[in-house]
A protein has these predicted regions:
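Short, structured secondary-structure boundary patches
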Residues: 8-14, 78, 122-126
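Residue-level signal for threonine
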Residues: 9, 82, 115, 119
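Secondary-structure end/capping motifs
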Residues: 16-103
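A bilobed periplasmic-binding-protein/Venus flytrap-type ligand-binding module shared by bacterial periplasmic
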Residues: 2-20
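Conserved C-terminal helix/tail region of periplasmic/extracytoplasmic solute-binding proteins
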Residues: 90-150
Length: 150
């Protein structure tokens, strides 16, 4: 099931060139960060820990490694939504009920609920700058969790 997303105003994306350009740059910067963390898991761990994480250093490194395994390699490019995964997620969200018997979605998402247009433009920018957006050579690192995650 797909998780996490970046949300934007569809009407503004379609009608406001500056808004769309900002969205493309924002997505490109986000994806560049994920590519950096793919190649520099320890440095990303250090950034998070230095910012005051309540979780310890080894736990943060383990978590970064696990997230990287979910993202990489990204055959279509990092951030591109696979339509089959989207359809599966929408179906689960309409059918799976919580303890109160409610679902996350009460009807199918509109046709414009997601787009790969922005991410594809962002990927083109990153590829032009030499950023590896697919991570075909990614291999997870070995992480040893310390007691208490420290």
């Amino acid at each position: 099931m797909l998780q996490d997303a970046i949300w934007a105003n569809g009407d503004k994306l379609a009608n406001d060139a500056a808004y769309k350009a900002t969205a493309v740059k924002f997505v490109a910067a986000s994806l560049k960060g994920w590519a950096y963390c793919r190649d520099n898991a320890e440095a990303c761990r250090d950034i998070v820990v230095a910012k005051g994480s309540k979780l310890g250093s080894s736990h943060q490194l383990w978590q970064m490694n696990e997230v990287n395994k979910l993202i990489w390699p990204a055959a279509g490019g990092v951030g591109v939504i696979d339509s089959a995964a989207w359809d599966r997620t929408a179906k689960i969200a309409q059918e799976a009920k919580n303890l109160e018997g409610k679902t996350v979605l009460t009807k199918a998402p509109d046709a414009g609920a997601y787009t790969n247009d922005i991410v594809n433009e962002a990927l083109a920018l990153l590829e032009k700058d030499g950023v590896d957006t697919k991570g075909d050579g990614f291999a997870p690192i070995t992480v040893t969790l310390a007691e208490g995650g420290n």
